[in-house]
């Protein structure tokens, strides 16, 4: 499958798209599901854990998330494709570092809800309600922000927490910070 181009904030036209609010998906079609699969492939190739449609230039309310297998804790890989996601409930607070494929070379500290309930549509167009917590809740909130034109840098706890990392290593640095900083929540 052909990889999609991931938009970055360095390009003014890309930034305009990234700052735009996405439209609701009218119908979950086979073509749209194939596009979501293409997004997953692109995200995997970029070593990401989440990708929202605006990050590949499509202003529709769709994101994909995939948490890698955690052999140490015997957790299988978790893959999510969600259309028209909406946070309907949240509680608790966690502080942690986030990176973004659209902001290469940086991570920053962001406060998010510890647990959220999200309504949306699955790949069959069926309504789903997901209750997620911890790191997965952080990733879902980050991707839903993209659908509203919000970048994680808009939510930094303090601008001084934005720090450079090797380009392409944002997600790895974020995962490392999450595993070391579980007590940060």
Question: Positions of the model-derived regions?
Answer:
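Positively charged
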Residues: 1-185
């Amino acid at each position: 499958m052909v990889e999609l181009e991931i938009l970055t904030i360095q390009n003014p036209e890309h930034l305009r798209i990234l700052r735009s609010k996405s439209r609701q998906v009218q119908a979950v079609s086979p073509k749209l599901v194939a596009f979501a699969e293409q997004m997953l492939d692109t995200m995997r190739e970029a070593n990401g854990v989440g990708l929202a449609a605006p990050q590949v230039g499509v202003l529709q309310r769709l994101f994909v998330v995939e948490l890698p297998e955690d052999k140490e804790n015997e957790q299988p890989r978790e893959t999510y494709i969600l259309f028209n996601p909406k946070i309907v409930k949240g509680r608790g607070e966690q502080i942690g570092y986030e990176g973004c494929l659209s902001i290469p070379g940086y991570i920053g500290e962001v406060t998010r809800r510890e647990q959220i309930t999200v309504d949306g549509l699955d790949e069959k167009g069926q309504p789903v309600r997901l209750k997620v917590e911890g790191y997965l809740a952080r990733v879902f909130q980050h991707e839903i922000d993209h659908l509203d034109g919000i970048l994680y840098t808009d939510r930094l706890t303090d601008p001084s927490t934005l720090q450079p990392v090797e380009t392409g290593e944002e997600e790895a640095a974020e995962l490392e910070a999450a595993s070391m900083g579980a007590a940060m929540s």
